[in-house]
């Protein structure tokens, strides 16, 4: 496997904690889709932050869901990111396209 996708799932809507049912539902949807398409995923909880229009630094819990792949499917990954963006009313959702060297032993 030479590449991986990472979709960053935020946990807020307009600086307010999002309902867990929405966040957890999106996490399950993304993980299920990546597992089906690429055989598996890794999820990591982290802290993300951004500067609000007011100038305030906003920090929130985020979930990074990563899947390694040999055959790309940008359309799937971008549609998942769009779903996250829409359901959590985000201006944008970050997707990493990473080169890596990995194998199963």
Predicted regions, residues:
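Positively charged, small/polar-rich N-terminal and surface patches that mediate targeting and assembly
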Residues: 1-105
């Amino acid at each position: 496997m030479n590449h991986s996708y990472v979709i960053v799932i935020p946990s807020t809507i307009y600086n307010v904690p999002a309902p867990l049912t929405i966040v957890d539902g999106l996490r399950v949807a993304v993980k299920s889709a990546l597992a089906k398409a690429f055989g598996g995923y890794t999820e990591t909880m982290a802290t993300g932050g951004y500067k609000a229009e007011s100038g305030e630094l906003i920090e929130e819990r985020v979930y990074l869901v990563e899947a390694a792949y040999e055959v790309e499917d940008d359309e799937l990954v971008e549609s998942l990111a769009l779903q996250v963006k829409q359901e959590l009313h985000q201006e944008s959702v970050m997707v990493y396209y990473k080169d890596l060297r990995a194998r199963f032993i």
